[in-house]
Design a protein with these regions (language model features):
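VWA/integrin I-like adhesion module and closely mimicked acidic/polar interface patches used
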Residues: 92-135
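Short, hinge-like loop/turn segments at secondary-structure boundaries
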Residues: 46-49, 132-135, 159-160
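Short, ordered loop/turn segments at secondary-structure junctions
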Residues: 33, 119-120, 145-146
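C-terminal "exit" segments of structured domains
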Residues: 140-186
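Conserved beta-strand scaffold positions in the cores of enzyme catalytic domains, especially
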Residues: 30, 114-116, 137-142
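A general structural motif
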Residues: 25, 81-83, 111
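Von Willebrand factor
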Residues: 1-43, 47-89, 93-96, 120-130
């Protein structure tokens, strides 16, 4: 997403791993796009510090969204080994919503749930993000700019799901804020 959000994500990403330590950890791959036609994926990492190191090297650049490339990448990865979840944070969608929906349907058929967190209230993005979440069996949630802890809690809940399934997500829901409980309602 945009630079202020990226900086916040770098700061809070460690929370994702706290939920997973008791369940054997979580492998994470950073996929990002920026600028003109640049979309990159890191190697898979297990340690929170390794992900922070990868994220701090990324600089934001203006450019169109490349959500289709991210979804295609997730599908390719899921063909090689199970991918439990894709977390996407964004504020707009400048792509063909029907094409994204088709890819999301393929992801859902492979068991890859997308948890899509939306900044702002762009109606095209809302439709695209809601459809992606629904077709994958994941969740769409609008982020509030008033709560600095919200993204941390939501990412922790998604990490719990990825590491321990629906039961772990339900456990996280019992312990956390109402917004986290919304993840199980999609």
């Amino acid at each position: 997403s945009r630079e202020p959000s990226w900086d916040r994500a770098v700061q809070v990403q460690g929370q994702m791993f706290l939920e997973t330590q008791a369940k054997g950890g979580l492998d994470v791959q950073l996929v990002y796009f920026r600028g003109f036609d640049e979309c990159r994926a890191s190697k898979w990492v297990r340690e929170p510090r390794a992900l922070v190191d990868l994220m701090t090297k990324v600089m934001c650049r203006a450019g169109r969204t490349q959500i289709e490339r991210v979804l295609n990448h997730a599908l390719r990865q899921a063909k090689e080994a199970p991918v439990d979840a894709l977390v996407y944070v964004g504020d707009c969608c400048e792509e063909d919503v029907d094409r994204l929906g088709h890819l999301a349907g393929q992801m859902g058929a492979r068991g890859v749930r997308a948890f899509v967190f939306q900044e702002g209230d762009d109606p095209v993005a809302s439709r695209a993000f809601r459809d992606i979440a629904k077709l994958t069996g994941g969740a769409h949630c609008r982020l509030s700019s008033t709560s600095p802890d919200e993204l941390r809690q939501l990412l922790g809940a998604v990490a719990a799901y990825a590491a321990g399934g629906v039961a772990a997500l339900e456990d996280a829901n019992r312990r956390q804020a109402h917004r986290v409980r919304l993840l199980t309602k999609s």
